[in-house]
Amino acid sequence: VAERDRLREQFYAIKAKAAGEGFFRRGKEQELYLNEANDLLYSILSQVKIKYPENSRASTLIKSMLEANPRAGACEEIIKLVQEALTSNGGKLNKTAKAKLIEAGFSIEEGGSHYKIVFHDSRYMFTVAKTPSEYREGKNLLSNIRNVVDVERKI
């Protein structure tokens, strides 16, 4: 799945470059899932747009960019899967929860009394107790994951 997403992203990048499109340079950081950067920019522009007067040039430009680059919503789906996985059993990772995390793009490593869940890249690793000590553990972990992974969160 990750390889397919990477190839699709390269295809869209080549297609956009050939068409002379694109208003920013992506940089060296690769997307972890399809349209991640697009959704980040869409979220930021949507939130900043309201800071400008409606009839201003900045507002008009932002509106035009948002219309030309619609939100894909992949991040929302990822967060929804993580939420389902972590809040259904108080944070305990049963088979169903693990399957949802894997579907969301996480890998799960078992070791000792904790799981290590990694979102595509070792920089985005979270530790989960195999037996949660309190009922809020799943909600706390969800909050931590949102802070790190959610590119559409409110700024």
Task: Spell out what each predicted region is.
Residues 1-25:
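Heptad-repeat positions
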Residues 22-39, 43:
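Proline-directed phosphorylation-rich, low-complexity intrinsically disordered regulatory regions
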Residues 39-78:
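Interdomain/boundary linker segments immediately adjacent to catalytic/signaling cores
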Residues 68-155:
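Long mid-to-C-terminal scaffolding/interaction modules that assemble large complexes
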